[in-house]
Amino acid sequence: MIIRVILALWLVALSTGCDRTPKADKTVVLANDGIFSADLTDHYALIGRTSGPAELWQLKPRALLHSWKHLEDESGIVHAAISGNERYAITAQRDSIAWWRIADGALLNVWSLPGIGSVSLSHDGLHALIGLPDKAVYFALNQGRTLYAFAHDKAVLTTALDRIGHYALTGSEDSTAKLWDLTNGALIYSWPHHNKLATVALSDDGQYALTNAALSQVFIWKTSTGKVYKDVGPKLLTLSAARFSHDSKYIVTGRTSQRIDLWRVSTGKLEKLWRPKKEDAWRPSAATILSLSFTDNESKIWSIATNGYLQRWKK
């Protein structure tokens, strides 16, 4: 009996006292049954599950604004994105993409595309970068046509666009990340990695690109030179989300192991880390961070994980 009591006390201490990372100042459960895809902005969260509709949530005050599905299809939403100006959103099933207007929830159009692996939405919400089995396409949503096709040897798994509409960044299963010029569709740089790409990101001003391959180093590149500016964190790391601050001074990253890190771009050094809430403190399993966003004049950070927990952190 005494041994059991000691063991119980030790487990409580382990689950509460040993984690001295800062706690979230706000925690909300958006989906009790978990989520598969998500995107965050300052004011909204767009979430998708493996079946059923996508949900657009207003964050302050919290309210479900829209529930979206692609026509009558019950397939799950595998990717989601909100435009930087918060006027439009896109949702992707495995073989179709839908364009939505946030103000009234209207479905603007649906297109069939096979094997969608990633989606990114331009700041104005009028263009999408869509990862496909052997390329990415830069698609004019308001015109319903492809402007550029960006070739890869294998599936494009992760994509990013800068705020000013100058660059597109694609990461592929072929172990390359490629930077593209959106003024003419030309390839600017091709950056080889040792494994398939897990996450890419671009700063708003287009000065910096982040790339990370599975179980590999995180790199920050200068887009003006194509050279590595800083390498970040441990050498064996897999990111599941990344977002630059609007002033490009910081980048916040999320791991598949349910950890959030804040890095200073100029030094590549870790400034702060957080460990988001687990569903069950007694279980070792962790949820993957799906999306991150700076908020409140960049003084705080939103995060959302596959367990459905939306949390806010003080920077």
Placement of each model-derived feature along the sequence:
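WD40-repeat beta-propeller superdomains and closely related acidic/aromatic-rich repeat-like regions
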Residues: 2-10, 17-315
